[in-house]
Amino acid sequence: MAGTLQFDIVSPERRLASFAATEVQVPGTDGDMTAMEGHAPTITTLRPGILRAHGPSGVQAYAVTGGFAEINATSISVLAEKAVAVEELTGTVLDEFIAEARELASVALPEDRDMAERTLNDMLALKASSGH
Protein backbone atom coordinates (compact mmCIF):
# COMPACT_ATOMS: atom_id res chain seq x y z
CA MET A 1 0.00 0.00 0.00
CA ALA A 2 1.73 3.19 -1.20
CA GLY A 3 1.63 6.33 0.88
CA THR A 4 1.35 4.62 4.26
CA LEU A 5 2.93 4.85 7.65
CA GLN A 6 3.18 2.19 10.33
CA PHE A 7 0.49 2.75 12.99
CA ASP A 8 0.76 1.24 16.47
CA ILE A 9 -1.46 1.94 19.48
CA VAL A 10 -0.78 0.45 22.90
CA SER A 11 -2.15 0.95 26.39
CA PRO A 12 -0.64 -0.36 29.63
CA GLU A 13 -2.92 -3.40 29.34
CA ARG A 14 -2.29 -4.44 25.73
CA ARG A 15 -1.50 -3.63 22.11
CA LEU A 16 -4.73 -2.56 20.43
CA ALA A 17 -3.59 -2.34 16.81
CA SER A 18 -0.62 -2.42 14.47
CA PHE A 19 -1.06 -1.89 10.72
CA ALA A 20 -0.14 0.27 7.73
CA ALA A 21 -2.33 3.39 7.68
CA THR A 22 -2.79 6.08 5.06
CA GLU A 23 -3.60 8.67 7.74
CA VAL A 24 -4.17 8.86 11.48
CA GLN A 25 -6.27 11.59 13.09
CA VAL A 26 -5.03 12.37 16.59
CA PRO A 27 -6.82 14.30 19.39
CA GLY A 28 -3.80 16.35 20.46
CA THR A 29 -3.78 18.49 23.59
CA ASP A 30 -3.00 21.56 21.47
CA GLY A 31 -5.54 20.62 18.80
CA ASP A 32 -6.43 17.79 16.47
CA MET A 33 -3.87 16.76 13.88
CA THR A 34 -3.57 14.31 11.02
CA ALA A 35 -0.41 12.26 10.53
CA MET A 36 0.45 11.00 7.05
CA GLU A 37 3.51 9.56 5.34
CA GLY A 38 6.30 12.14 5.32
CA HIS A 39 5.12 13.92 8.48
CA ALA A 40 7.73 16.00 10.28
CA PRO A 41 9.02 14.37 13.48
CA THR A 42 6.68 15.34 16.32
CA ILE A 43 5.84 14.23 19.83
CA THR A 44 2.47 15.38 21.14
CA THR A 45 0.36 14.75 24.19
CA LEU A 46 -3.17 13.45 23.73
CA ARG A 47 -6.38 14.76 25.21
CA PRO A 48 -9.46 12.58 25.71
CA GLY A 49 -11.09 12.00 22.36
CA ILE A 50 -11.41 9.72 19.35
CA LEU A 51 -8.32 8.65 17.41
CA ARG A 52 -9.03 7.43 13.85
CA ALA A 53 -6.64 5.36 11.74
CA HIS A 54 -7.41 4.80 8.05
CA GLY A 55 -6.09 1.36 7.12
CA PRO A 56 -6.57 -1.43 4.58
CA SER A 57 -9.81 -2.62 6.23
CA GLY A 58 -11.32 0.84 6.64
CA VAL A 59 -11.28 3.29 9.52
CA GLN A 60 -10.42 1.93 12.96
CA ALA A 61 -11.44 4.29 15.78
CA TYR A 62 -10.31 4.28 19.41
CA ALA A 63 -11.46 6.33 22.40
CA VAL A 64 -8.36 7.51 24.29
CA THR A 65 -8.19 9.18 27.69
CA GLY A 66 -4.77 10.76 27.17
CA GLY A 67 -1.20 9.74 26.49
CA PHE A 68 1.44 10.53 23.88
CA ALA A 69 1.92 10.13 20.14
CA GLU A 70 5.32 9.97 18.48
CA ILE A 71 5.12 10.74 14.78
CA ASN A 72 7.81 10.61 12.11
CA ALA A 73 7.93 10.27 8.33
CA THR A 74 7.26 6.52 8.35
CA SER A 75 5.36 5.74 11.55
CA ILE A 76 3.12 6.85 14.39
CA SER A 77 3.26 5.20 17.80
CA VAL A 78 0.48 6.02 20.25
CA LEU A 79 1.02 5.32 23.94
CA ALA A 80 -2.44 5.75 25.43
CA GLU A 81 -3.19 6.02 29.15
CA LYS A 82 -6.39 4.09 28.41
CA ALA A 83 -7.81 3.16 25.02
CA VAL A 84 -10.90 1.28 23.90
CA ALA A 85 -11.95 0.40 20.36
CA VAL A 86 -15.04 2.49 19.61
CA GLU A 87 -17.12 -0.60 18.87
CA GLU A 88 -16.35 -1.82 22.43
CA LEU A 89 -17.14 1.55 24.02
CA THR A 90 -20.14 1.57 26.36
CA GLY A 91 -21.79 4.10 28.61
CA THR A 92 -20.42 2.19 31.59
CA VAL A 93 -16.84 2.49 30.33
CA LEU A 94 -17.30 6.21 29.69
CA ASP A 95 -18.83 6.69 33.14
CA GLU A 96 -15.76 5.01 34.67
CA PHE A 97 -13.46 7.32 32.70
CA ILE A 98 -15.49 10.35 33.84
CA ALA A 99 -15.54 9.24 37.49
CA GLU A 100 -11.77 8.84 37.47
CA ALA A 101 -11.28 12.26 35.83
CA ARG A 102 -13.70 13.85 38.31
CA GLU A 103 -11.80 12.32 41.25
CA LEU A 104 -8.45 13.54 39.90
CA ALA A 105 -9.86 17.04 39.39
CA SER A 106 -11.20 17.12 42.96
CA VAL A 107 -7.79 16.34 44.49
CA ALA A 108 -5.59 18.25 42.02
CA LEU A 109 -3.10 20.74 43.38
CA PRO A 110 -3.89 24.36 42.50
CA GLU A 111 -1.23 24.43 39.76
CA ASP A 112 -2.69 21.26 38.19
CA ARG A 113 -6.38 22.08 38.58
CA ASP A 114 -6.86 23.75 35.16
CA MET A 115 -5.46 20.73 33.33
CA ALA A 116 -7.50 18.31 35.45
CA GLU A 117 -10.71 20.26 34.81
CA ARG A 118 -9.95 20.43 31.09
CA THR A 119 -9.48 16.66 31.05
CA LEU A 120 -12.81 16.19 32.84
CA ASN A 121 -14.55 18.50 30.35
CA ASP A 122 -12.98 16.59 27.44
CA MET A 123 -14.28 13.32 28.96
CA LEU A 124 -17.78 14.76 29.29
CA ALA A 125 -17.63 15.97 25.67
CA LEU A 126 -16.46 12.52 24.55
CA LYS A 127 -19.46 10.93 26.23
CA ALA A 128 -21.86 13.50 24.77
CA SER A 129 -20.52 13.00 21.24
CA SER A 130 -20.54 9.19 21.53
CA GLY A 131 -24.29 8.92 22.00
CA HIS A 132 -23.89 6.82 25.18
Curated annotation (Swiss-Prot):
<keyword id="KW-0066">ATP synthesis</keyword>
<protein>
    <recommendedName>
        <fullName>ATP synthase epsilon chain 1</fullName>
    </recommendedName>
</protein>
<dbReference type="InterPro" id="IPR001469">
    <property type="entry name" value="ATP_synth_F1_dsu/esu"/>
</dbReference>
<keyword id="KW-0375">Hydrogen ion transport</keyword>
<dbReference type="Pfam" id="PF02823">
    <property type="entry name" value="ATP-synt_DE_N"/>
</dbReference>
<comment type="similarity">
    <text>Belongs to the ATPase epsilon chain family.</text>
</comment>
<dbReference type="GO" id="GO:0045259">
    <property type="term" value="C:proton-transporting ATP synthase complex"/>
</dbReference>
<comment type="subunit">
    <text>F-type ATPases have 2 components, CF(1) - the catalytic core - and CF(0) - the membrane proton channel. CF(1) has five subunits: alpha(3), beta(3), gamma(1), delta(1), epsilon(1). CF(0) has three main subunits: a, b and c.</text>
</comment>
<keyword id="KW-1003">Cell membrane</keyword>
<keyword id="KW-0813">Transport</keyword>
<comment type="function">
    <text>Produces ATP from ADP in the presence of a proton gradient across the membrane.</text>
</comment>
<keyword id="KW-0406">Ion transport</keyword>
<keyword id="KW-0139">CF(1)</keyword>
<keyword id="KW-0997">Cell inner membrane</keyword>
<dbReference type="GO" id="GO:0046933">
    <property type="term" value="F:proton-transporting ATP synthase activity, rotational mechanism"/>
</dbReference>
<dbReference type="InterPro" id="IPR036771">
    <property type="entry name" value="ATPsynth_dsu/esu_N"/>
</dbReference>
<dbReference type="InterPro" id="IPR020546">
    <property type="entry name" value="ATP_synth_F1_dsu/esu_N"/>
</dbReference>
<keyword id="KW-0472">Membrane</keyword>
<dbReference type="GO" id="GO:0005524">
    <property type="term" value="F:ATP binding"/>
</dbReference>
<dbReference type="GO" id="GO:0005886">
    <property type="term" value="C:plasma membrane"/>
</dbReference>
